[in-house]
Swiss-Prot record:
Protein name: PII-type proteinase
Biological process annotations from GO: proteolysis
Organism annotation: Lactococcus lactis subsp. cremoris (Streptococcus cremoris)
Signal peptide: 1-33
Keyword field: Cell wall, Hydrolase, Peptidoglycan-anchor, Plasmid, Protease, Repeat, Secreted, Serine protease, Signal, Zymogen
Enzyme Commission number(s): 3.4.21.96
Active site: 217 (charge relay system), 281 (charge relay system), 620 (charge relay system)
Length: 1902
């Protein structure tokens, strides 16, 4: 809007003031503003009578004065209205005393058009000096020293004065006015003061009027009381403007003048409010930009940076609980709409860590497009510190990395202003103040209260200091409490115990509350404690806590006042580091400069939903600060009174947005590091410095001159360099009308040359000066008015300065007019390529104790999906390391390890990444993965895990090129290789991990027992000799052993030497139980041993006890147990009320025996004996009773030779229930719990009711309340006795109780879930790819549940099932809003169903034949062709190896087709080669084709044998030739070898003497040497011979003419043939022609025929025919049968004609391609015409939500783009896109028929009720999904899902659903939770909504 025209004097003052604003104190500007505001009352005199004028002015002034006093005192914590009248008059206030004399800006001493800073300061000093006499008089009245003096804009000074004395000051001669100093309450007053925002408001009155800022975030609450404009008359976006936009866009709506437009892009509805319960990120961001609160309490009112700016609510995060991330399609739509509707600035406080800078990224491309439209983009840098800070995400480097960047995408966008975070000086937070009512006051100090319910729990309580045994402050142990704690507030020290335990023990001691004193000895508050919320607790710093302890010790019986409230307190973090420790480091990984600038982002107070407020931290808070500031800058540019308005008006597009960014960076103030001698903070951390909004506006109003690097960027990017002298150029632009000269500052701190350093004690990164380094200008810096000057500078480094270090700093320039320019610079001295891309095994990041195993191989068991760390060994001290010689897996399906993959700790972002498996000779076996880029590893604070690169698994199989089948690789040594190029570098790095494929188990021999006696104790060992010929015996030395069936599953072996034939002698100690089981005689031994590949040998042996000479009876398992129960090994129950007990053992002879039953009767045992092994087995029946039994074993059947006697007790009587009742006998309940009661038999030990152990009373009775869920609940009750016998009873109880009727109230069938559902043509049973219709079925929980999808009420059947259809089309991301409600409750919740699909397979056209074999003698075969798809991503595999892929993060809704040119080499094997080529799109639709190639090495064939028909003189001679081998063809030449042709079957008829050459050829292109055969026996000039020669030449001339007329050959050779034909005809016409002349003419003509070149060579023909086949398939029947009006033929017929022409070869490839292009253009036009004709205007003019354009525009754009394509394959891709569009439009038409809308969405149903207003549901803003695999547990295994594969058949279009994955697993604990809160940096991932923080589509191989 236009600003109101100011009075001339004010305008001039404002203009002149520009020269001094760089040195003008903020106080003077505020003084001017206060005076202006509080003297407006005098204007009333112009509108009232003289009689009333005085009274009106007096009343107004009094009211204004009282309000100003009250406001000022409120800021100091004093309630003016509660003071009595005497106190009100006596209290001191701050005032501004203004002099009668004019200030320097108005007294005529300065030029109104231009004055230098020096001149302004000189005149200002004169004005201030003249104030001396007045100041003296004022000080006499106030008894206070005068404060700050002003002389430029205001002639006056500040002072303190009692209210009663204010009139006295007004009476002093020379005093014009006395004005109350105004109090400002911005977003965070301290944050804005850091950036001088108030000065802009005050001096320029810029508050964002007429500007629009787009908030692309989680949503805005437009009803918040601070979301307002002071005046909505002259807004940029009116309601009418918005309605015009929404009429076109077909989405979004107008809300109010402050938030004129909003739309929920994630859920496709108008619910723009974030329903997250804990915190609303977008609302906080919106408040920082433009809240416009009123009132004096900063905790209850917020004013943003640009409070009068309008805000767009572009909600891109769903209200669904299923996802806290967003995707490319959603973001791009919001960005594009922001630009279309006219946003001046867009803010994105979101991103995914460590991004790249490529326009292949759709978000970065969208940002650039927005810039080009003139919308500035401001984006947060990220909250991850450095990649070297391990789990902390702060300003540290524990690994010594050269590449520590973490700036996120889309913040890496070149044109965006990327913002780092500084700490706020003060913070509004919950704080405690402790007073005794007299002299003690502790605080206010920031605290963390266990629950807000306890704010009053500490007030007026007594305190109790808990002391330990030494009399020191206790850490809260139970034993340290006494009875004195009861009812008091206990005070303990931090440490040893968990916070929860401290609370528990204090509560148990009867304390009323707990205060935990920090233990670090500092004043740092304790604000990150894991407290329970059930007991009043908070913490104090060490300093404050000790003061409290001391006071309580002196006043043990006194109570204290404790006030806990929101309070403005100093930010402790600011005193430790002015920058926020979490702010992400730059630069971009290619050494581009980022971040750009810093703003306050740490501890910012801003708005929340429902008129709420909260404190949040993050670059998410810093970014909106800059967005608001750029709105102010844009307002300044729009000010027609600005002296540079004419220049600003012509700025458009990126020129405008770059200018705003440059001005802010040029005027930013570099921050110094208070912890390291005030050196600079690295530009890689702070960018250009802290924003100074006042300085930026000053520049725009006074002198908008700038300095940039040679490439136009407002920072110097030196990249990497190796010379100690580095030159660079700066461009200075003077936009004033006067010449400017600049001097570079020589401050030894700010302007020194710096490099990075690491504090060895803390790991903190800081900058240090490079001694001897300097930067000098090559010439004086003089810039003519209105011109630019390019100046060369030289950076000089000392020769001793080591390479591989950053070099950085700031260049500051002072202009001749006093203006200043700031420019950061940064580069890398050394080779950026050199830094490793991946950490090595056991490398710098390897820290098992911290849960980080770094780079590590993973071995997977396919049956269970469990993963294990490969080669992991543990030394004697318990340290784990990876032994790279022990990494192995087996191709034996029975082995534990069935495949290998790698989890890489990437140290850098890398591009052109390839993962290969190599054999022992370094030959490539397969390529597992090929991708454009991979992101470095970092710790994601939101998901609490490291984000690794999980590379694909190899299962030991390979593609056999000979037959096209998958085969198992041979055992041997292999290499797992990753290679890639570091971003910003150009050299490929390789990292190899060796491993072995071993399918053979180790061999074991000579199993025996040995014994050693140590300290009087005999230790027995199981010994053996073992050998493994490949992977080696298990490096962990783990074995399993059994002695007489007593097992030891955790045994280990030791090496005891090596045999001569290479066996390792091993010995394993027996456990005590195994030793006890040993007997004299044959002991059964079992040794289970594996190799490193997990192949197992299970060796059984019979061993003798060392030293034994007798053979005693041995019963396995240590003998018959003392008790036989249902849990005893060997017992097996039967159905007759008993069972059988079986035992076994060894004895050198048969064993017999007896047993006694329950009645004491003796019976014979059932025994068997194996003489070969000396083993026996015996069994005895037992009954379900408790009784004593005896077992006797004998050496004879007569039972005379007793071997052993056993006494045992049979204990098989199970416990019993009496009077067992479930729910008092009822099967139904409406309660939350049911009661289970009963009595059990006396021998019962425990009763388990579900998961609860019931308490038994003295009568063995129990009663348990069991919670039940809605629906059927099966309740199990199990009684267990002392012997382990159990009895179980169960009952099903149906519960109608449901505390949350809406929780889990809707479930879907066939795998459909709320959130993202991603599928392709064949992977979803609910979807029909032919129609594009999805049929969604499911069930609701209650009959009262209601379900609304996309605005339509879904009918619920009587059986609670439902079914509805959605038209999804064939491609895109389609969100549908879902509202679930219940008719019995007045509430709903909102969810979303999002479908991400591609139902169209890519096309694949190969240049080589796929129908007939190809033969070659060249081992290097090139596969060429093209692939297209309806979306932009394609990947290519050849022979199962992934060889190429495109940028994976695509906008699937862009409508842009995909295209890939194929040109891949393949090394051929000798003989047959089956080459399988497959292309796959973004949703795993795959098209496959095979090429069969036969290859034989090039060789020289044996020469053919030539035989003449006669050697006698003859008229003709027939020459026949035979090849030396079968399969060869003999060719001849009659023209000396110029041309050859096949020898006819009948031979070559020769009519004239001459020399003929013959050679043999084969299919592979091999040839023999040519042999000459000279014909000399033709009789000359024989009339018959002459006639024959004429006839032969006549025939050949006729043949030549036929060939010339065929049109198959190119012009050059056809012309040569015509000339040869004419020459032959001339020879024929000669009357004196001889046989020789005719033969020569014949030979020349034959040569010309042989040299004819086909218009369409064979390879081109094959390629074209394949291409035509693909086109015909894409057209399908309906489109192919339509007629081209220009030709009258169907398109299929036209293609058939092309096929015929290609087969005939009468046109060149270019001609045929041109014709094909015309056909495809006609097809595109016909298809577009048909779509448009079938689309009613109301639908065609409606908006496609995916593209933001009308359907008609989508059709036209796709048609135009397709017809503009030069390549037929591109046209085919656009045809696919148009076909996909056809499906979408048809769906929109169908929807319009039903509900009257045309945007592809549905509106109000005519049956199911109206469009619901979705109620928000919780989401989790700022959470990155860990998208690259889960982490192994510390125990060494990772549970995962088994990998699957799906093969494809020849030339089939198939779906690939089973790509190998590395699995999912449990996350290892990584130590104590970080003590800083999540900072709201929104993680973004795409389409599976997708993995690790976020924006990115799923990675193909993960």
């Amino acid at each position: 809007m236009q600003r109101k025209k100011k009075g001339l004097s004010i305008l001039l003052a404002g203009t002149v003031a520009l020269g001094a604003l760089a040195v003008l104190p903020v106080g003077e500007i505020q003084a001017k503003a206060a005076i202006s505001q509080q003297t407006k009352g005098s204007s009333l005199a112009n509108t009232v009578t003289a009689a009333t004028a005085k009274q009106a002015a007096t009343d107004t002034t009094a009211a204004t004065t009282n309000q100003a006093i009250a406001t000022q005192l409120a800021a100091k914590g004093i309630d003016y209205n509660k003071l009595n009248k005497v106190q009100q008059q006596d209290i001191y206030v701050d005032v501004i005393v203004q002099m009668s004399a004019a200030p320097a800006s108005e007294n005529g001493t300065l030029r109104t058009d231009y004055s230098s800073t020096a001149e302004i300061q000189q005149e200002t000093n004169k004005v201030i000096a003249a104030q001396a006499s007045v100041k003296a008089a004022v000080e006499q009245v106030t008894q206070q020293t005068a404060g700050e003096s002003y002389g430029y804009v205001v002639n006056g000074f500040s002072t303190k004065v009692r209210v009663v004395d204010i009139p006295k000051l007004k009476q002093i001669a020379g005093v014009k006015t006395v004005t109350l100093a105004k109090v400002y309450y911005p977003t965070d007053a301290k944050a804005n003061s850091m950036a001088n925002v108030q000065a802009v408001w005050s001096n320029y009155k810029y508050k964002g009027e007429g500007t629009v800022v787009s908030v692309i975030d989680s949503g805005i609450d437009p009803t918040h009381k601070d979301m307002r404009l002071s005046d909505d008359k002259d807004v940029k976006l009116t309601k009418s403007d918005v309605e015009k936009f929404t009429d076109t866009a077909k989405h979004g709506r107008y809300f109010n003048s402050k938030v004129p437009y909003g739309f929920n892009y994630a859920d496709n509805n108008d619910t723009i409010t974030d329903d997250t319960v804990d915190e609303q990120h977008g609302m906080h961001v919106a408040g920082i930009i433009g809240a416009n609160g009123t009132g004096d309490d900063p905790a209850k009112s917020v004013v943003g940076v640009a409070p009068e700016a309008q805000l767009l609510a572009m909600k891109v995060f769903t209200n669904s609980d299923t996802s806290a991330t967003t995707g490319s399609a959603t973001l791009v739509s919001a960005i594009e709409d922001s630009a279309k509707i006219g946003a001046d600035v867009l803010n994105m406080s979101l991103g995914s860590d460590s991004g790249n800078q490529t326009l292949e990224d759709p978000e970065l491309a969208a940002v650039q497009n927005a810039n080009e439209s003139g919308t500035a983009a401001v984006i947060s840098a990220g909250n991850s510190g450095t990649s070297g800070s391990a789990t902390e995400g702060v300003n540290k480097d524990y690994y010594g990395l050269q590449d520590n960047e973490m700036v996120g995408t889309p913040g890496t966008s070149r044109g965006a202003t990327t913002v780092a975070s500084a700490e706020n000086t003060d913070v509004i937070t919950q704080a405690v103040t402790i007073t005794d009512g007299t002299g003690l006051q502790l605080g206010p100090e920031t605290i963390q209260l266990s629950s807000n319910d306890f704010t009053g729990s500490f007030d007026q309580k007594k305190f109790y200091v808990v002391k330990d045994a030494s009399g020191n402050l206790s850490k809260g142990k139970v034993a340290d409490y006494t009875a004195d704690a009861k009812g008091k507030i206990a005070i303990v020290k931090r440490g040893e115990l968990t916070f929860a335990d401290k609370q528990k023990y204090a509560q148990a001691a009867g304390a009323a509350g707990l205060i935990i004193v920090n233990n670090d000895g500092t004043a740092t508050p304790v604000t990150s404690m894991a407290l329970t919320t059930t007991f009043p607790t908070f913490g104090l710093s060490s300093v404050t806590g000790q003061k409290l302890v001391d006071w309580v010790a002196a006043h043990p019986d006194d109570s204290l006042g404790v006030k806990i409230a929101l309070t403005l307190v100093p930010n402790q973090k600011y005193t430790e580091d002015k920058m926020s420790d979490f702010t992400s480091y730059g630069p971009v990984s290619n050494l581009s400069f980022k971040p750009d600038i810093t703003a306050p982002g740490g501890n910012i107070w801003s708005t929340q939903n429902n008129n709420g407020y909260t404190n949040m931290s993050g670059t998410s808070m810093a970014s909106p600060f800059i967005a608001g500031s750029q709105a102010l800058l844009k307002q300044a540019l729009n000010n027609k009174n600005n002296p540079f308005y004419a220049y600003y008006k012509q700025l458009k597009g990126t020129a405008l947005t770059d200018f705003l960014k440059t001005v802010e960076m040029n005027t930013a103030q570099p921050i110094n590091d208070i912890n390291y001698n005030n050196v600079i903070v690295s530009p890689r951390r702070q960018g250009a410095g802290l924003v100074d909004v006042k300085a930026a506006i000053d520049a725009l109003e006074k002198n908008p001159s700038t300095v940039v690097a040679e490439n136009g960027y407002p920072a110097v990017e030196l990249k990497d360099f190796t010379s100690t002298d580095k030159t660079f150029k700066l461009t200075f632009t003077n936009r004033t009308t006067h010449e400017l000269t600049y001097q570079m500052d020589s401050n030894t701190d700010t302007n020194a040359v710096y490099t990075s350093a690491t504090d060895p004690n803390s790991g903190v990164l800081y900058d240090k000066k490079i001694d001897g380094a300097a930067i000098k200008a090559g010439s004086n810096i003089t810039v003519p008015a209105g011109k630019t000057a390019q100046i060369e500078f030289t950076l000089s480094l000392p020769k001793s300065f080591d390479q591989q270090q950053f070099v950085e700093g700031f260049l500051n320039f002072k202009g001749s007019d006093g203006s200043r320019l700031n420019l950061p610079y940064m580069g890398f001295f050394g080779d950026w390529n050199d830094g490793k891309i991946v950490d090595s095994l056991n490398g710098i990041t390897y820290s098992p104790a911290g849960g980080n195993f770094g780079t590590v191989p993973l071995l997977t068991n396919k049956n269970t999906g469990t993963q294990y760390y490969g080669g992991m060994v543990t030394d004697a001290d318990g340290n784990q390391t990876v032994d790279d010689q022990a990494i192995a897996f087996s191709s034996d399906k029975n082995a534990l390890y069935n495949d290998i993959s790698m989890k890489y700790y990437l140290l850098r972002n890398i591009s052109n990444v390839q993962v290969d498996i190599l054999d022992g000779q370094g030959n490539k076996v397969t390529t597992l993965s090929s991708s454009t880029n991979r992101k470095k590893t970092y710790y994601n604070a939101h998901s609490q895990q490291y984000i690794y690169y999980h590379a694909p698994a190899w299962d030991g199989t390979y593609y056999d090129q000979r037959d096209g089948n998958i085969k198992t690789a041979d055992d041997g040594s292999y290499t797992y290789r990753i290679s890639g190029v570091p971003e910003g570098g150009d050299k490929r790095q390789v990292f190899d991990v060796p491993f072995k494929l071993d399918s053979k188990a180790p061999t074991v021999r000579h199993v025996a027992l040995s014994a050693k006696t140590e300290n009087g104790k005999t230790q027995y060992y199981l010994t053996a000799e073992a050998k493994d010929d490949l992977s080696g015996l298990d490096a962990t030395k783990s074995v399993k052993t059994a002695i007489n069936e007593v097992t030891n599953l955790d045994a280990t072996f030791t090496d005891a030497g090596t045999t001569a034939d290479g066996y390792t002698k091993i010995e394993t100690p027996l456990s005590d139980e195994q030793a006890q089981a040993l007997g004299n005689g044959d002991n059964s031994a079992e040794l289970y041993l594996t190799d490193n590949a997990s192949n197992a040998t299970d060796q059984d042996a019979s061993v003798q006890k060392p030293g034994s000479t007798s053979f005693d009876l041995i019963v396995n398992g240590g003998g018959i147990p003392d008790k036989i129960s249902s849990t005893t090994t060997g017992y097996e129950a039967n159905t007759q009320g008993g069972g059988t007990y079986t035992f076994s053992g060894t004895y050198p002879a048969a064993v017999d025996g007896t047993y006694t039953d329950a009645q004491g009767k003796k019976h014979d045992l059932n025994t068997t004996y194996d003489a070969a092994t000396n083993s026996f087995t015996a069994s005895m029946p037992v009954t379900n009773a408790d009784y004593a039994a005896q077992v006797d074993l004998y050496a004879d059947k007569a039972h005379t030779q007793l071997l052993k006697h056993f006494d045992t007790k049979v204990r098989l009587t199970a416990p019993t229930f009496t009077d067992l009742k479930f729910n008092n006998g009822s099967d139904q309940t409406s309660e939350a719990t049911i009661k289970v009661t009963g009595t059990v038999s006396a021998d019962t030990k425990t009763v388990n009711v579900g998961d609860t152990v019931a308490a038994l009373d003295a009568q063995h009775h129990f009663s348990v309340d069991v919670p039940v869920n809605y629906g059927d609940n099966t309740i199990k009750v199990t009684a267990t006795d002392e012997d382990g016998n159990t009895t179980t009873e169960q009952k099903t109880i149906t519960s109608s109780y449901d505390p949350d009727m809406l929780k889990n109230s809707v479930t879907f069938d066939q795998g459909v879930t709320f959130g993202a559902n991603e599928f392709n043509a064949t992977s979803a049973k609910f979807y029909d790819p032919k129609t594009g219709i999805a049929t969604i079925t499911g069930k609701v929980k209650h009959p009262t549940t209601t379900l609304q999808v996309d605005g339509k009420q879904i009918p619920i059947k009587d059986d609670l099932t439902f079914s509805f259809t959605l038209d999804l089309g064939t491609l895109g991301q389609k969100p549908f809003g879902v509202v679930v409600g219940d008719t019995t409750q007045n509430k709903t919740f909102q969810e979303a169903l999002t479908f991400i699909l591609d139902a169209v397979a890519p096309t694949l056209s190969l240049d080589s034949s796929t129908d007939a074999p190809v033969y070659t003698n060249n081992p290097n075969f090139q596969i060429t062709g093209t692939a297209t798809d309806n979306a932009q991503y394609l990947s290519l595999s050849i022979n199962g190896s992934s060889v190429a892929s495109q940028y994976v993060d695509i906008n699937i809704n862009s409508g842009k087709p995909g295209h890939m040119a194929i040109d891949q080499p393949v090394k051929l094997l000798e003989g047959k080669n089956v080459l399988t080529v497959a292309v796959t799109d973004s949703e795993d639709n795959t098209t496959t084709k095979n090429i069969t190639v036969y290859y034989e090495p090039k060789k020289t064939l044996a020469a053919p044998t030539v035989t003449p028909s006669t050697t006698e003189p003859a008229k003709t001679v027939t020459l026949t030739a035979n090849s030396a081998a079968t399969g060869e063809t003999v060719q001849y030449s009659a023209d000396g070898g110029k041309t050859y042709q096949d020898v006819p079957a009948a031979g070559v008829t020769v009519t004239a003497n001459g020399t003929f050459k013959f050679k043999s050829t084969d299919l592979y292109g091999n040839e023999s040497p040519a042999v000459d055969y000279v014909v000399t026996n033709i009789k000359a000039d024989d009339p018959a011979q002459l006639q024959a020669a004429k006839q032969e030449l006549t025939n050949l001339i006729a043949s030549a003419k036929t060939l010339s007329a065929s049109g198959k050959y190119d012009d050059a050779t056809t012309t040569a043939l015509a000339a040869a034909t004419q020459k032959a005809q001339t020879a024929l016409d000669q009357t004196n022609a001889s046989v020789d002349s005719l033969t020569g003419a014949n030979r020349d003509l034959q040569t010309a025929i042989n040299q004819l070149a086909a218009k369409l060579p064979a390879d081109k023909k094959t390629s074209l025919l394949n291409q035509l086949q693909s086109v015909k398939a894409a057209l399908e029947t309906d489109l192919g049968n339509q007629t081209d009006s220009s030709t009258g033929k169907t398109f299929t017929a036209a293609l058939d004609d092309l096929v015929a022409q290609a087969q005939a070869g009468t046109q060149t490839d270019d001609q045929l391609q041109a014709t094909l292009a015309k056909v495809l253009d006609a097809v595109l036009a016909k298809l577009a015409e048909g779509i448009k004709a079938a689309t009613p205007a109301e639908v065609g003019n409606a908006k496609d939500a995916a593209t933001g354009k009308t359907w008609y525009a989508d059709i036209a754009d796709t048609l135009t783009s397709g017809q503009a394509s030069a390549d037929a394959s591109d046209k085919l891709a656009h045809l696919q896109a148009l076909q996909s569009l056809k499906t979408k439009v048809a769906a929109a038409v169908e929807a319009a028929k039903t509900v009257g809308k045309g945007d592809g969405t549905t509106g109000t149903s005519d049956k199911g009720g109206g469009q619901g207003t979705p109620a928000p549901t919780p989401g989790d803003i700022g959470k990155d999904k860990g998208d690259e695999g889960s982490q192994p547990s510390s125990g060494g295994n990772i549970p995962t899902n088994p990998a699957t594969t799906t093969s494809t058949s020849t030339d089939d279009t198939t779906d690939r659903n089973g790509q190998l994955t590395s699995g999912k697993g449990a996350l290892p604990k990584t130590g104590e939770t970080t003590e800083r809160p999540a900072f709201g940096f929104l993680g973004v991932i795409v389409v599976s909504l997708m993995g690790v923080l976020g924006l990115k589509r799923k990675q193909r191989e993960e």
